[in-house]
């Protein structure tokens, strides 16, 4: 009964639920971001084999965030998480210049998947606190984001350990998805 009341109140007051898939190469900071958003603190992480899933409440939206491991051997499993994904968060290690082309290839491969054709894209240009980090404009260029047609996308500079930029990214995601659901 309590769940029914909560569900009705959520519907009355416009609480939205959104399924978000967070991917990126290994060591980009996905798990650190997930738990910074969920717990507000830095947690010690180990490479994710499989996935972590958490619900993050923000601005009357319940984001179900799937953080999927990024090691090359398990990237083929990403597609198993595509169904019903409304938003894709692609996390890039802004300091990893050697692998930015690999990140681009993985991103473009995913964006060509039919199941993700309607998903909006948020890129977290993570690790901006590091001295040699590429800025968002450089990452936009290296990922080829300007070539994307018929897809809403946004890039946000972030630092997972301090939390800088994370909520700005969620703001864009929530606004974009809310506007889309009104159509």
Curated annotation (Swiss-Prot):
Keywords: ER-Golgi transport, Golgi apparatus, GTP-binding, Lipoprotein, Myristate, Nucleotide-binding, Protein transport, Transport. Its main location: Golgi. Transmembrane segments: none annotated. Coiled coil: none annotated. It comes from the Eukaryota. A lipid is attached at residue 2 (N-myristoyl glycine). It is found in: Golgi apparatus. The keyword Transport applies. GO terms for molecular function: GTP binding; GTPase activity. It holds the Pfam family Arf. The lineage of its organism: Eukaryota, Metazoa, Spiralia, Lophotrochozoa, Platyhelminthes. GTP-binding protein involved in protein trafficking; may modulate vesicle budding and uncoating within the Golgi apparatus. One of its GO terms (biological process) is vesicle-mediated transport. This is ADP-ribosylation factor. InterPro entries: Arf1-5-like (IPR045872), P-loop_NTPase (IPR027417), Small_GTP-bd (IPR005225), Small_GTPase_ARF (IPR024156), Small_GTPase_ARF/SAR (IPR006689). Gene3D superfamilies: P-loop containing nucleotide triphosphate hydrolases. The keyword Transcription regulation does not apply. GTP binds at residues 24-31, 67-71, 126-129. One of its GO terms (cellular component) is Golgi apparatus. Belongs to the small GTPase superfamily. Arf family.
């Amino acid at each position: 009964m309590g769940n029914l009341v909560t569900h009705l109140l959520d519907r009355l007051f416009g609480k939205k639920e959104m399924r978000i898939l967070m991917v990126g190469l290994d060591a980009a900071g996905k798990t650190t971001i997930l738990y910074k958003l969920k717990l507000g603190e830095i947690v010690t992480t180990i490479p994710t084999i499989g996935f972590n899933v958490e619900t993050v409440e923000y601005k009357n939206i319940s984001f179900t965030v799937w953080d999927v491991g990024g090691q090359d051997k398990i990237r083929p499993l990403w597609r198993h998480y595509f169904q019903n994904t409304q938003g894709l968060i692609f996390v890039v290690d802004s300091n990893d210049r050697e692998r930015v082309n690999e990140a681009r290839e993985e991103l473009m491969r995913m964006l060509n998947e039919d199941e993700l054709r309607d998903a909006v894209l948020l890129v977290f240009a993570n690790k901006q606190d590091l001295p040699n980090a590429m800025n968002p404009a450089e990452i936009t260029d290296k990922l080829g984001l300007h070539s994307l047609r018929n897809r809403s996308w946004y890039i946000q500079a972030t630092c997972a350990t301090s939390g800088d930029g994370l909520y700005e990214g969620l703001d864009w995601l929530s606004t974009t998805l809310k506007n889309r659901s009104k159509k």
